[in-house]
Amino acid sequence: MPEEIATLAGGCFWCTEAAFKLLRGVLEVVPGYAGGHVPHPTYEEVCTGTTGHREAVQVRFDPGVLPYADLLRYFFAVHDPTSEDRQGPDVGPQYSPAIFYHSEEQKRVAEAVMRELAPLYPKPIATKLLPFTTFYPAEAYHRDYFARHPEAPYCRFVIAPKLEKARKAFKSLLRP
């Protein structure tokens, strides 16, 4: 089976990058910016909330090891899909959750997973399902942020608890 790309926005990309690196079948995770109208945005520009971009990750994965539906179920567990412009302490349109589908098949699978999971939440799912257009990798200092700064307060109090929750809930999907 050929590799696939998933582009997902689930709040702070430091969190989502660290979360997806835990999974079997994930070959690469790149933090960056997706969905906006400003070409080659900087972090500072995206933080203004005026570029239309969301903090996102591009996940290159082997669907023979990690089916896209399982990747999405995991994604829904590591972000709050009922919150439109907020993920934990992070507020603004750049933290708005979205699935950027790369094919009609990805769109179909995402719609099915969203229907499957919707009854589990007390509020409607706010995560948007959007066609992929462009992705701009984030600046180098954002890459592997959690791995390089595990003692930073944001990493200890926001990312680490999220990863621990994911490890407990998705043991079968994790790398050995």
Curated annotation (Swiss-Prot):
Its EC number is 1.8.4.11. It is an enzyme of class 1 (oxidoreductase). SUPFAM superfamilies: Peptide methionine sulfoxide reductase (SSF55068). It catalyses: L-methionyl-[protein] + [thioredoxin]-disulfide + H2O = L-methionyl-(S)-S-oxide-[protein] + [thioredoxin]-dithiol; [thioredoxin]-disulfide + L-methionine + H2O = L-methionine (S)-S-oxide + [thioredoxin]-dithiol. GO terms for biological process: protein modification process. InterPro entries: Met_Sox_Rdtase_MsrA_dom, Met_Sox_Rdtase_MsrA_sf. Keywords: Oxidoreductase, Plasmid. The active site is at C12. One of its GO terms (molecular function) is peptide-methionine (S)-S-oxide reductase activity. Signal peptide: none annotated. PANTHER family: PEPTIDE METHIONINE SULFOXIDE REDUCTASE (PTHR43774), PEPTIDE METHIONINE SULFOXIDE REDUCTASE MSRA 2 (PTHR43774:SF1). Belongs to the MsrA Met sulfoxide reductase family. HAMAP family: MsrA. Has an important function as a repair enzyme for proteins that have been inactivated by oxidation. Catalyzes the reversible oxidation-reduction of methionine sulfoxide in proteins to methionine. This is Peptide methionine sulfoxide reductase MsrA. It comes from Thermus thermophilus (strain ATCC 27634 / DSM 579 / HB8). The gene is msrA.
